[in-house]
Amino acid sequence: MTQSLPDAAEQVAAAEKESALVRIIDDEIDVREALALMLRIEGWTAKTYPNARAFLIEDDVRRPGCLVLDVRMPLMTGLELQNEMLRRGLMLPTIFLTGHADIDVAVSSLKRGAVDFLIKPVNDEILLESIAAAVHCDFLRRAGVAGGEGGIRTFSLMPIKSKT
């Protein structure tokens, strides 16, 4: 029996979700814990870090997934981490999530390859859509599929429509 395209796509998405890791870096413990809980309820595996340096020391970026990153943090800002990741050749798709909206920072992060730039408090559905797209792009990039890396940059410039 042949599966329909939507069923096959759902299985691929489920397989990606099962093996992906969503890394959350935020200096506010309440934010980290709330995001991690929401992601786990939605079936994602999440790991939290209190700052960028802890992430750089502890994380295994060989595992596919994405990064949900606060902008303003002590020790190393989100933008500084993004720059350090680029310097090291770490290609993990990054979603910035901040309570401090700044157009210059948003544009700068997107130009450097961020997948998305979202403002706290963020709608859970919008964040989940952004995470799913980022993870999918990471799997494509790792598989060497055309559009994996470019798909991230294209997606970063597309607005996400609210479902409210």
Predicted regions and their residues:
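Non-catalytic signal-transmission and effector/linker regions of two-component phosphorelay proteins
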Residues: 1-23, 29, 36, 51, ...
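Acidic catalytic/metal-coordinating carboxylates
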Residues: 50-51, 76-81, 101
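Short amphipathic alpha-helix used as the core "switch/output" element in two-component signaling
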Residues: 57, 79-90, 108
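Active-site beta3 strand of CheY-like receiver
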Residues: 62-68
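Receiver (REC) domain active-site loop signature in two-component systems and cognate sites
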Residues: 73
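C-terminal output helix
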Residues: 102-104, 122-132
